[in-house]
Amino acid sequence: MPLLDSFCVDHVKMKAPGVRLAKSMKTPKGDDISVFDLRFCKPNEEILPEKGTHTLEHLFAGFMRNHLNGNGVEIIDISPMGCRTGFYMSVIGTPSEEAVKKAWLASMKDILEVKDQDKIPELNKFQCGTYKMHSLDEAHAIASKILAQGLVIINNDEIKLDVDAMGLKKH
């Protein structure tokens, strides 16, 4: 099995919260695709709470589109990482990390403006697979923490992991 890109970065050195361009590629038709690592938590030190992450997923996706889509950029998907330290965002186009950072911060402010659980998009049994697993309070706490700490741009060269030199397994 090939070693995935996400396992070729040193999670010990990774700063958080921060934005990282995880991958860029071209489709066979020549379209640019960018994948961003939106790291909310320092890996192996903290994780996002389950219910707050789920609520954030419902809110963050729409707000990021409001702030980032346009001028050749369109968000394909924003999904939480299995390790619960952040989200991956796939985008058509090549927005700068600074533009992503600005949109992320604006989205966190928008999340704090949502005052009622009933205002969470698609929060019903027809559109959400676990519609009872939400917490607006936890989502607010996550957003507040990001705004208080600010965001860094994560440099890929600084966190590149040499799996051969470290003797790590490549499955």
From Swiss-Prot:
Gene Ontology molecular function: iron ion binding; S-ribosylhomocysteine lyase activity
Reaction equation(s) it catalyzes: S-(5-deoxy-D-ribos-5-yl)-L-homocysteine = (S)-4,5-dihydroxypentane-2,3-dione + L-homocysteine
Binding site for Fe cation: H54, H58, C128
Presence of keyword Metal-binding: yes
Keywords: Autoinducer synthesis, Iron, Lyase, Metal-binding, Quorum sensing
Gene3D superfamilies attached to this UniProt entry: S-ribosylhomocysteinase (LuxS)
Presence of the UniProt keyword Lyase in the record: yes
Annotated signal sequence range: none
GO biological process, one term: quorum sensing
Cofactor list: Fe cation
Quaternary structure note: Homodimer.
Family, per entry: Belongs to the LuxS family.
Function, in words: Involved in the synthesis of autoinducer 2 (AI-2) which is secreted by bacteria and is used to communicate both the cell density and the metabolic potential of the environment. The regulation of gene expression in response to changes in cell density is called quorum sensing. Catalyzes the transformation of S-ribosylhomocysteine (RHC) to homocysteine (HC) and 4,5-dihydroxy-2,3-pentadione (DPD).
Protein name per the record: S-ribosylhomocysteine lyase
Organism: Campylobacter concisus (strain 13826)
